[in-house]
Amino acid sequence: VKGTAREVKKMLLKMVACCCSLLLLAGFLSGCNVISDPISLMQTPTMSDEKQQLNGAVNTQLGAVQPLRPNDPDDPTPIRTGDLNNDGIDEAVLFYETPDESVKIHGALFEDQGGTWVKKLTFDGEGTVLESFKLVDLTNDGTLDIVAGFSSGDSSENGDQKGLIVYSYTGGTLEKIYATGYTDFVVDDFNHKKMDLNGDNLNDLTIILLRRNEFFTVKTFQFSGGTFKEIGSLELDSQALGVYNVVAGKVAQGRQGIIIDTKIAETTTVSNVIVMDHGKLRKLNLMDVTFKDATIASGDVDGDGILEFGNLEKPKGWSNRPLDEVPYFVSFYQWDGAKGTIFKQQQYRDSNEQVYFRLPKELHGKVTIDPKVSRKDSYLRFILDDTDKTIAEIKFFSLSQWERNNEGYSQLWRTNAQVIGIKRSSELEPRKTIKNKMGERQVE
């Protein structure tokens, strides 16, 4: 972008003013969720002096390498710091590409020596893509271990072979203490806290491995006597097409578990809820609520610290309509810790998941989408099914329609082709929550 400093400043002020206007408009929404967080996008990241020194040390001592960001949406940070050998001094770890060498990815470990970062060693990675990168105490000795996942980068069916390596740093040397193939793995919960399936207060490592039409296994390990020992194993349906989401943490009050969202047909998925009872892994028998014709990611949707799994719910009055015309609700449930489930939240999502419209919990089972006038991804009238009273309307506008007459709707989401707007009634208290694929922002 070219221009004088004054012009740039003027342009930025206009952009901030525009974004603030959008957020003020969002303040009138009722639990409506959009894929837009302009303020967070506009914030200029600031780098601490320590990070600047570390980046400078990396450039000086490794050459002009670019630290690799792992393909992990939860934490793509390229350089991790922590005390890896329990000496009270932080180390820093990163991975970088070495395309002209036989080993295409290498790692480097730096040590903070009196405020100066000094490279202590480099080490081999695997594959050509850094999939995941964590510092976790898997050896349960009070020191952090390096846990890294690599792949070949082959996206063809059954082609991408992933490999997990656990490294331990002791006595000034780095040792590879475990290596295995994986489809996904779990070493911490969704809050990046200890994962402890068997309740012995020690960290676990769980490996999920799917080889289609051959096997689909879940195995949990703990480090003991200098090696990782299997403490639980479970076989799932090997006919599954793939795993599209894995999340771990509390699955009920006082119970930790893992939810493996799995695609089992072109449009059909199931959420496998895995817990450990009496030293054995088991899958909960919840097929009536975890089997669905949609790709819905499990997670803590209501922020209570316990994981939920989702399912489709057809609004009343739509039973005779073709399936592709039905504007389904997405309902989320928790395991009750015994043999049943607890309803937690209901949402409407458009087909492209641009807008999440969250209905108040107390209205569950009392709201439908008027089948007489509503059309999916065009116009939706949300009504109380006993009185026919309108509580909300969502409408899709072309840009020209919106500019010409927005009909009193508030903007939820805008692209270069359309605007999605909403009207709401007093039944929907203005909680003013914006939730989207890029995070959540509370607007007071």
Q: What are the residue ranges of the model-derived segments?
A:
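Sec-dependent N-terminal signal peptides of Gram-positive bacterial secreted proteins and lipoproteins
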Residues: 11-37
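N-terminal secretory signal peptides that target proteins for export/translocation
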Residues: 1-11
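Beta-propeller-forming repeat regions
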Residues: 27, 31-382, 399-426, 433-444
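Charge-rich, low-complexity amphipathic helices
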Residues: 5, 380-386
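A short acidic-to-branched-hydrophobic micro-motif
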Residues: 384-400
